Amino acid sequence: LFWVIELGPMISSAISHNGIVYNSTITGRIFAIDVYKKKINWQKEIGSPLVSSLLLYDNLLISCTFNSWINDINSKPHDRNFIYALDINNEGKKKWDVQISGDIFSSPCVCNRKIIVIGSLDSTIYALDMRGNIIWTFNTGGSIWSSPATNNYEIFIGSDDCCIYSFDLNGNLKWKSMLEGKIRATPSLMKSTNSLFIGTHNGIMYCLNQSDGSIKWKYETGKPILSSVAISKDHIFFGCSDKKIYSLKSTNGSIKWKYETGDKVWSSPVVTQKNDDDKEEGMLYVGSLDSHIYGLGIESGRLNWKFPTMDGIESSPCIVKNKMFISSKDGLLYCFSNQQKMDNEKSILNLPIRKCF
């Protein structure tokens, strides 16, 4: 463990760029932390719950609000939610904001360096230019919890209407494919095989053709899949509400291994490849609601490393330049370094924790 800092309850995933890690809290704060100096560069009070992950593009940090979190996650959509653009070079000063009608759980993405795309619980997909102008919208038949994915020419996103949609950058619908179950995970794209991987609330992992949405194969787990797929060569990896982490062959969906944790796995895994001179296999890292971070061998599925937190983990790891960042509902942001030995089951109660609010 390189450091740990207390920020406040988080389910969003951290992002890192140029030695600065950014994350947001359910209590409505955004933090910019210097990775190596282990200190807060700046923090911004938004004043509304933030549950989707931030997007950093050029000098803009995009954040979105989820005001219904204040009362009840199942309450009706709040009528005042915002998409904010903050200037990272000016201590998070607001550049622009856009008001929309629905809560935002979906995390934004940038397409072809031109537009920001995001989904909302008001069933609408929004596309904005870099100045915050809405350039097109599209209404689906259900709330959108899924985050968009892009290959820079097309946009893919799932909806609670059990459909996954494909658009061009002008918002024209290319295709939609109805699957079995609500879609709340984020699509993952595999360029080499023109494949799209997505899991559903009915517990089915699908492989679709990116060009037309046709089903190549499907694999049934039996429990909701909220985790998004990580891809490594010819295998995919994802977590499931049945407490397991799965590895499937990307070409036909046959199972290679599965590993059971102590609770649901909503976190999306990340994988690291071994070096050519490394005798060890590559690693998969993922969090679980059982309050542990897991490190598994991607070839064997063997547990190589496990670290306890003080509450469940819904966020996904972020790995940049030998540093791994992951946040927890315990209010702590963890930074691990693979240049230091990762101690198994080391209690965080014995670690110095900086409180930053």
Positions of PLM-derived features:
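Extracytoplasmic/lumenal domain signature
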Residues: 1-11, 15-357
